[in-house]
Curated annotation (Swiss-Prot):
Its cofactor is [2Fe-2S] cluster; Mg(2+). It holds the Pfam family ILVD_EDD_N. Keywords: 2Fe-2S, Amino-acid biosynthesis, Branched-chain amino acid biosynthesis, Iron, Iron-sulfur, Lyase, Magnesium, Metal-binding. PANTHER family: D-XYLONATE DEHYDRATASE, D-XYLONATE DEHYDRATASE YAGF-RELATED. This is Dihydroxy-acid dehydratase. GO terms for cellular component: cytosol. The gene is ilvD. [2Fe-2S] cluster binds at C119, C191.
Amino acid sequence: MRSKKMTHGLEKAPHRSLLYALGLTREELSRPLVGVVNSANEVVPGHIHLHTIAEAVKAGVRAAGGTPMEFPAIAVCDGLAMNHEGMRFSLPSREIIADSIEIMATAHPFDALVFIPNCDKSVPGMLMAMLRMNVPSILISGGPMMAGTGNGKAADLITVFEGVGMVRQGRMTEDELEQLSETACPGCGSCAGMFTANSMNCLSETIGLALPGNGTTPANSAARVRLAKHAGMRVMELLERDIKPRDIVTEKAVANAVAADMALGCSTNTVLHLPAVFAEAGLDLTLGIFDEVSRKTPNLCKLSPAGDQHIQDLHRAGGIPAVMAELDKAGRIHRDALTVTGRTVGENLDALGAAVRDHDVIRPMEKPYSPQGGIAILYGSLAPEGAVVKQSAVAPEMMQRTARARVFESEEAAFEAIMAQRIEKGDAIIIRYEGPKGGPGMREMLSPTAAIAGIGLGADVALITDGRFSGGTRGAAIGHVSPEAADGGPIGLVREGDMIEIDIPARKLDLLVDEAEMERRRAAFTPVVKEVTSPLLKRYSRLVTSAANGAVYKR
């Protein structure tokens, strides 16, 4: 066993002394040692209950003959970090999480690992660490929050964000907004729509690194606790059979994940996170692959923010297994891909009797919301290396549009203009120097997009940025424009009043400026370099690569 490096032999008597100091017995040290990575904290609603999940995991490990040893991981709440300097630290936290787990799991050589994330960057960060360490492992997340209420309707955090713009428009009072804010998020769990956290938790199932039910079983349910116990027991079986993450994460797992991503209408952040995760297994997931899969995979679900339904509705309709079963009908799933159950995807679907129980939530393959997937990759003179849009959340009027550029050098400047009602129908808001390097940190632009929707311009205004978007963003929000402005990308050359052509069906994003003028602008162009005081962000800016590559570190 790997743990023998710190438990066995004459020379390890000092190590055993330290382990005995933890209260462990000789019998416990003779069993496999299982690291339990718990990202619980009292700051993030999606993580407030993870101690309960961890206790269930440890009970499962003990029941199966192992000795669990818990250690912590950080987790940022993107909602709380939104629209201020804190958001610059969110994406970098993904790498910090992966690196810190590598440190702990190498310094203390556990035989197996159980990962307990829930919200945005904790899931990809832990998946990256899992593949990097490549010891028998399983992921069990905290589960989704239930939808809240507002004005007698289902509501979630995005309802509140959009309410800010509604107040400015006079369509809601501040008191009404405060009442909504008290009821929209009713308790623990990752925010209730198909936002980034739930997207990644659902996709962890499709990759095969989490048990069926991981993505949709509610956070506040006894079923979630039972699932955590099963995860603890299951990791012991993976250890016994020596099944490691890289045995599971193959090109077939990549294909399954991207197909499910498109069918579910997941967050555009998956286009950053999946390449970063799969890179740890030596697998290359390019924007071209996303686009290829999107063109031939129908969009079967429209959960919030694209529609009115939530993760609890997806769970009731059969969850991720039902979506995969529907995709399987058209041969879009690799049934022979291995999973942490020890069985293949196909065997899991058959054993579960996976089927859609509500076709209003999960559309049949022959009657999808759209014949193409939820995410589209755009290219053109404004985005030579690509840009990303959640086309399933774009109003029909904005799928093809020529718009007038309104240029802003930061999120704050754009948000101020929106709230001051200086943005008009037909505008394309350009927010630049918000990329991974130039931000630095690639902030999410949820506040501006929610404000656009809140003031009633969601079907009339586009937002284009080298930054990124929340999974809760809806509308013509085109992000990850690459190269970014800080790397000399064309987005840095856009001027106020330029015309921009958006053609999502044709996958085009073009700046309608002739080449001679572009050459003059390039010759006079010097990228803006922001003053950065944080040592972490300085290092991040030096090390990070393009969003087109998942914003991973240089290798």
